[in-house]
């Protein structure tokens, strides 16, 4: 079968590698189709993995070749020596290794000689002494060369019968000093170098053209005649040199080349003037077959020395054809199957119509076996032997080495079918050979199986809670079953975690007379009395706070405005900054325990878990928070103790964090294998046994956990590869023991596009004789999990790792057998507390939720007021708080009631494309980002709108405009110009540095214009949380700073900002503009999402519970702020527009073309030079499959250079921080560079854009490649 074809009219030589290289040189005496007289020497890698059609070395030479020879590797010549015989009588030697590496013909040249007086027609290296070279040419000249000495050659002696031309030389394969020559004299001479003379010569009726020695017998050789009238192949035994042993006929014209296979004496190949290449059995004297003919003389044919299955034939039709002895190509009839005449001729012209024809079928020696045995897939043993009649007998029988394996897999299979792992769990707990850690895992699984997740979580927190109430924990009922969550009497455990009923206190009624005489009061008290009597409550509160009368201020604030309440609240926390109770009050009053989960001492992890259970809004929220608690336990020390490990495992199991759990189990596999090998267990005698048993233990725990949590879907998520690798390996091992059905059940857990899955399924189906089932598993690249931190995956039993800022991807933290399994730092997250209820107006049903992308909320263009100071904010913090929710924007009045929210919106899932634009997981370790603690929440009020949610997608209602046009998924973000309001031009820096600052809000309207009352409000409770106490009153719930913004009654597409016009709305401007959110998609990004795709959720834990309706519109009124370049506010259709205010546009800076670097200012030039030089250093080292990532990285960095050149994006502070990043990268301090880069994104998010992912990728690639 044809393997390759080289379009060259060249002679050639193979090297001695198992996958051989081939050297070719333009043959002398041939006329090219273009009449070229040039000549070249080339080396080809026929079996290259890249399937390249180009030579690995090529160079022009002055003369053409008659022959080429390639020696075996020798001392100092790792790839041997290449010798060329030129038509001008020159012989030249080259070092092949030097040719390939340096590509320099002159540098690789070892020796060059013109000892021959005429053309050199043939040469060959001694097979037994690789440094000895034999050459022959015109004038009967024969020379022997020593490539070690590189001196003048020696002649073997005088011939008995002189020859005019030597056409072929051949060394004896058994005796190193014997060789044969043949030429135009009609004789074949046998020479002995020791005696330096011709010792024998053979003759026949026709002239000989070539000669070859028997591979193993020193006295036998074969010759061929070049006579066109009588082309013969003759075998000789020199013991009787008078006549040939065998005469073989088949060629129709003279034979030009012979080669006797070194590995099989019964195979000989020949080629000649009849354009044919034939295969012979010279021992039996019979023709075996014929290979496709060429279009001209086939002048040279040779087997590959170390790969005899391969041979090549060179012909004067300009081709070197590489073929295999065996032909496995389909028959001609199957290649051209069309019945149409025209199609037939079209196909036949491009189809290989010639095929080898074998008259005798004979296996080569290397394939012959009198008997053999082999292990078959599925624990089978196949043996082949010969019977008395020399017929092969094949036996296939099962082979079972370890009966314990069969028993183990059988029990595992039964547990899977019945979905009951209790027997396995009990057996593993009672097995004394298991380690304490492993037993602890099985005991936890047993407990989880007995009481379920809720009961399991009760047991975690019940001890601390019930001890505080003088009770003993009661996890299960008398019959051992888990009590229902809603038993009669409202005895649910989590309901009891709420506040106990407050002991009633009689209402205070003032009695008796009192004096308000201020004569004997202090000046401060006098001021307070006067303010109270003047009904100036707000001023009185401020005066009380100034006089440290906190109790009086608190009482006064009860009926004051939300701003006053917030001011008093912050004053309280400021005065009690170091008090732990105050810190807890802060978290409890805000109904947000993010601060507790993130910062409380993990030594009190059970108390933290109890708080998580009490305050979580839903199961997903609870899972994410308790998983984060597990991460903190693991990371509390560099070497976590067994107790810490078990405590973290409890949290992970309670939080459905399958990937976290599996990563711990997989990381412990090597240690478990080691303990098995050291144990006296009779079932474990080899490392292979230990590996299977440890992997089986992992699979049992994994499947038991999935059974307990009722997870029936396939595995999914961006970090499942280590688990999938382990499952695939175990399935392979189980199938190797013949358990095909069990192995296939494991494979059903894997995503359909997982690498190696299709091959393994096909192998199992073939071995079991069943058809491959159509995979119903989802693709890991076509279905994506929700984008959130440590939240519960849509797939039960699998958790999704944290969402990282920007384009940072997930990477393994340490090298393990399955990759990416070492302890990973917990990423920061922002949790979603319970959603408060609020009044709503009657609304018609909402239209069905569309699959189109929701319209992004337009940020306020009027700036934001100064927030109240935060007692817990760190000193020197930046003014920007990425986790602070934006202030609400008051909805505009509408002509008709807006549609009601009929149900929860569909969760937004991003469509994961395993994008080439994402940095691969294996490139870099993941680093956790610091996160801010939650902001305090102001007291509840029936405000017209809730705060916008920075971490949840805006909900879509039926009043929005049509879908946005398709476009790019990412756009460079630019800062939105803001105009400060009259109320907030002097916000202090200290006030802006708040991590825990309460969100800004509107006051509830106190009256309605024209005396028309608003519709009767209906109070809706938030979705029921099975883990939190029931709310006593919906009006007392605090506002939720992380809840999603309520849809406005009418939303229109944001308009393009126009210079000289200010937007106007009937309701007046919003005094509180939302802060910039660096992690939410810009309006442009959302509007340009492809149609039919929902943009990714950006909330840490997804949207807050639905079931709420929009609040009534606020009172119309207010004064427009100073005009400026603004974005058109969304407004209702019947909103009246204010007259535009003309503005003088600011002077524009010159814009330089993309790619120009000549105008980069001095302050920024360091950034450009540093990053550009680093890019050029990284690019050559990037693996081929990541080239696209590198190209995208460079493209994005060019966006940064363009911004630097135009000086139009980065502030001086941002440039200074970027310089620090560059300095850290230059110093190869990649950890510092990464942290500085994250800080840059946090502090200057509005100045990032298309270029920022390029910088992140550059740092990662530099760390991985330099």
Curated annotation (Swiss-Prot):
Residues 463-475 have a biased composition (Basic and acidic residues). Residues 883-907, 1068-1078, 1110-1125 have a biased composition (Pro residues). Its main location: membrane. Transmembrane segments: none annotated. Keywords: Cytoplasmic vesicle, Endoplasmic reticulum, ER-Golgi transport, Membrane, Protein transport, Repeat, Transport, WD repeat. WD repeats lie at residues 5-45, 60-104, 115-155, 161-201, 203-246, 250-290, 293-333, 374-397. GO terms for biological process: COPII-coated vesicle cargo loading; endoplasmic reticulum organization; positive regulation of ER to Golgi vesicle-mediated transport; positive regulation of protein exit from endoplasmic reticulum; protein transport. Gene3D superfamilies: 1.25.40.1030, Functional domain of the splicing factor Prp18, YVTN repeat-like/Quinoprotein amine dehydrogenase. PROSITE patterns: WD_REPEATS_1, WD_REPEATS_2, WD_REPEATS_REGION. Residues 774-789, 930-948, 968-990, 1044-1057 have a biased composition (Low complexity). Residues 463-492, 760-1157 are annotated as: Disordered. It is a peripheral membrane protein. It is found in: Cytoplasmic vesicle, COPII-coated vesicle membrane; Endoplasmic reticulum membrane. Pfam families: WD40. The keyword Membrane applies. Residues 826-838, 1000-1017, 1031-1043 have a biased composition (Polar residues). GO terms for cellular component: COPII vesicle coat; endoplasmic reticulum exit site; endoplasmic reticulum membrane. GO terms for molecular function: structural molecule activity. The keyword Manganese does not apply. InterPro entries: SEC31-like, WD40/YVTN_repeat-like_dom_sf, WD40_repeat_dom_sf, WD40_rpt. The COPII coat is composed of at least 5 proteins: the SEC23/24 complex, the SEC13/31 complex, and the protein SAR1. SEC13 and SEC31 make a 2:2 tetramer that forms the edge element of the COPII outer coat. The tetramer self-assembles in multiple copies to form the complete polyhedral cage. Interacts (via WD 8) with SEC13. Component of the coat protein complex II (COPII) which promotes the formation of transport vesicles from the endoplasmic reticulum (ER). The coat has two main functions, the physical deformation of the endoplasmic reticulum membrane into vesicles and the selection of cargo molecules. Belongs to the WD repeat SEC31 family. This is Protein transport protein SEC31. It comes from Meyerozyma guilliermondii (strain ATCC 6260 / CBS 566 / DSM 6381 / JCM 1539 / NBRC 10279 / NRRL Y-324).
């Amino acid at each position: 079968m044809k393997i390759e074809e080289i379009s060259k009219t060249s002679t050639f030589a193979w090297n001695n590698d198992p996958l051989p290289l081939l050297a070719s040189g333009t043959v002398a005496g041939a006329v090219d189709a273009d009449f070229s007289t040039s000549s070249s020497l080339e080396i080809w890698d026929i079996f290259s993995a890249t399937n390249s059609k180009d030579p690995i070395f090529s160079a022009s030479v002055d003369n053409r070749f008659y022959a080429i020879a390639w020696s075996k590797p020798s001392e100092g010549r790792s790839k041997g020596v290449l010798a060329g015989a030129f038509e001008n009588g020159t012989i030249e030697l080259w070092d092949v290794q030097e040719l390939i590496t340096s590509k320099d013909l002159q540098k690789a040249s070892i020796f060059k000689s013109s000892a021959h007086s005429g053309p050199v027609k043939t040469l060959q290296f001694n097979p037994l002494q690789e440094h000895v070279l034999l050459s022959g040419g015109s004038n009967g000249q024969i020379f022997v060369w020593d490539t070690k000495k590189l001196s003048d050659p020696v002649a073997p002696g005088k011939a008995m019968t002189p020859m005019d031309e030597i056409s072929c030389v051949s060394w004896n394969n058994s005796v190193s000093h014997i060789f044969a020559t043949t030429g135009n004299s009609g004789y074949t001479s046998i020479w002995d170098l020791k005696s330096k003379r011709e010792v024998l010569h053979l003759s026949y009726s026709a002239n000989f053209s070539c000669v070859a020695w028997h591979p193993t017998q020193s006295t036998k050789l074969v010759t061929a005649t070049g006579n066109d009238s009588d082309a013969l192949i003759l075998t000789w035994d020199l013991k009787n040199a008078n006549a040939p042993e065998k005469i073989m006929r088949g060629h129709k014209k003279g034979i030009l080349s012979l080669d006797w296979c070194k590995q099989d004496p019964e195979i000989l190949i020949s080629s000649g003037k009849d354009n044919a290449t034939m295969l012979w059995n010279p021992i039996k004297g019979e023709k075996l077959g014929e290979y496709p003919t060429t279009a001209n003389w086939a002048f040279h044919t040779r087997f590959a020395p170390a790969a005899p299955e391969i041979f090549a034939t060179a012909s004067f039709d300009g081709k070197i054809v590489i073929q295999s002895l065996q032909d496995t190509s389909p028959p001609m009839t199957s290649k051209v199957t069309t019945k149409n005449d025209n199609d037939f001729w079209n196909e036949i012209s491009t189809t290989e119509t010639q095929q080898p024809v074998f008259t005798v079928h004979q296996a080569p020696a290397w394939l012959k076996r009198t008997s053999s045995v082999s292990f078959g897939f599925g624990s089978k043993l196949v043996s082949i032997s010969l019977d008395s009649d020399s017929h092969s007998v094949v036996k296939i029988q099962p082979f079972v080495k370890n009966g314990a394996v069969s028993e183990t897999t059988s029990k595992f299979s039964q547990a899977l079918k019945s979905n009951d792992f209790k027997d396995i769990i009990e057996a593993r707990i009672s097995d004394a050979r298991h380690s304490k850690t492993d037993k602890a895992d099985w005991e936890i699984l047993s407990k989880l199986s007995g009481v379920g997740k809720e009961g399991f979580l009760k047991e975690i927190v019940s001890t601390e809670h019930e001890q505080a109430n003088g009770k003993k924990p009661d996890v299960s009922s008398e019959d051992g079953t888990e009590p229902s969550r809603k038993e009669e009497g409202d005895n649910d455990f989590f309901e009891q975690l709420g506040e106990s009923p407050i002991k009633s206190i009689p209402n205070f009624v003032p009695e008796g007379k009192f004096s308000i005489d201020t004569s004997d009061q202090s000046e401060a008290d006098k001021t307070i009395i006067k303010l109270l009597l003047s009904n100036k409550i707000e001023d009185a509160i401020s005066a009380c706070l100034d006089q440290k009368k906190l109790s009086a201020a608190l009482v006064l604030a009860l009926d004051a405005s939300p701003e006053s309440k917030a001011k008093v609240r912050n004053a309280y926390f400021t005065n009690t900054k170091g008090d732990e109770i105050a810190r807890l009050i802060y978290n409890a009053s805000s109904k947000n325990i993010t601060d507790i989960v993130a910062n409380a001492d993990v030594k009190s992890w059970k108390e933290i878990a109890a708080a998580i259970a009490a305050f979580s809004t839903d199961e997903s929220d609870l899972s994410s928070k308790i998983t984060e608690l597990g991460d903190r336990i693991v990371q509390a020390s560099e070497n976590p103790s067994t107790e810490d490990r078990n405590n973290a495992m409890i949290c992970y199991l309670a939080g459905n964090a399958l990937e976290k759990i599996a990563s711990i189990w997989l990381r412990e596999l090597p240690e478990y294998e080691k303990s098995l090998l050291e144990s006296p267990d009779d079932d474990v005698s080899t490392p292979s046994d230990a590996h299977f048993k440890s992997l089986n233990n992992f699979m049992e725990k994994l499947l038991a956990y999935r059974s307990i949590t009722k997870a029936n879907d396939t595995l999914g998520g961006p970090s499942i590869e280590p688990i999938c690798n382990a499952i695939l390996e175990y399935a392979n091992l189980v199938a190797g023991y013949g358990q095909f059905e069990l192995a296939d059940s494991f494979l059903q857990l894997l995503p359909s596009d997982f690498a190696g899955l299709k091959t393994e399924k096909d192998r199992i189906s073939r071995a079991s004789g069943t058809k491959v089932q159509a995979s119903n598993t989802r693709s890991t690249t076509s279905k994506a999990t929700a984008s959130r931190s440590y939240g519960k995956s849509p797939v039960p039993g699998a958790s999704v790792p944290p969402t990282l800022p920007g384009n940072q991807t997930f990477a393994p933290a340490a090298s393990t057998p399955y990759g990416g399994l070492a302890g990973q730092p917990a990423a920061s997250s922002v949790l979603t507390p319970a959603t408060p209820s609020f009044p709503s107006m009657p609304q018609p049903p909402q239209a069905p939720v569309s699959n189109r992308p929701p319209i992004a909320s337009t940020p306020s263009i009027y700036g934001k007021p100064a927030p109240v100071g935060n007692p817990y904010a760190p000193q020197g913090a930046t003014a920007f708080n990425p986790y602070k929710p934006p202030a609400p924007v008051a909805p505009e009045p509408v002509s008709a009631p807006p549609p009601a929210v009929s149900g929860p919106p569909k969760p937004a899932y991003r469509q994961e494309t395993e994008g080439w634009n994402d940095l691969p997981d294996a490139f870099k370790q993941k680093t956790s980002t610091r996160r801010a603690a939650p902001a305090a929440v102001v007291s509840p009020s029936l405000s017209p709108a809730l705060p916008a949610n920075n971490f949840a997608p805006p909900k879509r209602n039926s009043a929005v405009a049509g879908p946005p046009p398709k476009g790019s998924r990412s756009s460079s973000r630019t800062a939105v110009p803001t105009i400060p309001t009259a109320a907030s031009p002097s916000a202090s820096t200290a006030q802006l540095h708040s991590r825990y600052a309460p969100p800004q809000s509107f006051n509830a309207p106190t009256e309605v214009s024209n005396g028309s009352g608003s519709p009767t409000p209906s109070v809706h409770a938030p979705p029921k949380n099975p883990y939190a106490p029931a709310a006593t009153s919906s009006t007392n719930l605090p506002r939720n700073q992380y809840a999603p913004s309520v849809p406005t009654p009418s939303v229109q597409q944001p308009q393009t900002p126009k210079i000289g016009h200010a937007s106007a709305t009937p309701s007046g401007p919003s005094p509180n503009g939302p802060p910039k959110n660096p992690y939410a998609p810009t309006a442009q990004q959302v509007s340009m999402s492809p149609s039919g795709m929902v943009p990714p959720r950006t909330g840490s834990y997804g949207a807050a519970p639905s079931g709420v309706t929009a609040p009534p519109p606020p009172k119309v009124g207010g004064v427009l702020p100073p005009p400026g370049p603004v974005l058109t506010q969304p407004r209702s259709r019947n909103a009246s527009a204010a007259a535009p205010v003309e503005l003088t546009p600011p002077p524009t800076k010159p814009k330089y073309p993309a790619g120009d670097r000549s105008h980069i200012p001095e302050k920024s030039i360091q950034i450009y030079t540093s990053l550009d030089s680093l890019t050029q250093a990284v690019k050559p080292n990037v693996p081929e499959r990541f080239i696209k990532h590198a190209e995208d990285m460079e493209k994005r960095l060019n966006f940064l250079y363009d911004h630097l050149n135009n000086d139009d994006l980065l502030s001086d502070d941002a440039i200074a921080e970027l310089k620090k990043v560059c300095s850290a990268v230059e110093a190869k301090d990649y950890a510092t560079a990464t942290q500085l880069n994250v800080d840059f994104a946090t502090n200057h998010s509005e100045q990032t854009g298309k270029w920022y992912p390029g910088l992140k990728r550059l740092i990662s690639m530099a760390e991985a490649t330099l």
